[in-house]
């Protein structure tokens, strides 16, 4: 716990509060290594109210998550403990309006919980941008169900990935076609893309 205290030193939390939250996270099933990473990503979680976090966990279980899934999601996005259930529920409803089923939103958020931290207008802009590239709305929905992390990439990152692939002699039409079936290409380094494409063509 000493390393966590060092990370939190600038926040002025007293040792008793840190220990209470530390013990709470340990009891939930987090390891010390996981808590250190969480403290680095969002140190304020060690100042959150324990009763509020417990309530959040119980409400998320009602939405369809297991405790193990919540632990995994909050390792990626520890600030989820600071989001209200109302905001999470609203995000699920907003994404249903985009074309997902409730079950699909739950499923993709398990892989990319960061979507709960993105404004719905940000998601809409990402969809509109991808439509401008040549994808159909239903293709984008399918791609993001298969590879939800696309939503966490900035538009500039996607633009750069397309430019990098064009340097490999692929046209934009080629790239659109390839990524429809394999959207995880957007998550590869340019060094790995060529090998992946060659493997797909064999």
Placement of each model-derived feature along the sequence:
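Long amphipathic alpha-helical repeat/alpha-solenoid cores
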Residues: 1-202
């Amino acid at each position: 716990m000493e390393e966590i205290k060092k990370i939190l030193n600038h926040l002025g939390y007293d040792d008793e509060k840190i220990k209470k939250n530390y013990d709470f996270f340990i009891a939930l099933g987090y390891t010390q290594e996981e808590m250190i990473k969480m403290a680095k990503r969002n140190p304020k979680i060690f100042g959150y109210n324990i009763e509020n976090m417990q309530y959040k966990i119980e409400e998320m279980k009602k939405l369809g998550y297991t405790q193990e899934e919540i632990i995994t999601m909050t390792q990626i996005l520890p600030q989820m403990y600071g989001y209200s259930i109302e905001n999470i529920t609203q995000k699920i409803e907003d994404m249903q309006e985009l074309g997902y089923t409730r079950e699909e939103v739950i499923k993709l958020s398990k892989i990319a919980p960061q979507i709960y931290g993105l404004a719905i207008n940000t998601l809409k802009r990402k969809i509109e941008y991808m439509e401008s590239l040549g994808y159909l709305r239903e293709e984008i929905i399918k791609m993001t169900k298969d590879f939800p992390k696309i939503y966490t990439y900035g538009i500039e990152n996607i633009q750069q990935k397309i430019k990098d692939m064009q340097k490999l002699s692929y046209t934009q039409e080629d790239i659109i076609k390839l990524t429809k079936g394999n959207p995880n290409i957007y998550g590869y380094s340019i060094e790995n893309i060529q090998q992946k494409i060659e493997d797909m063509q064999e």
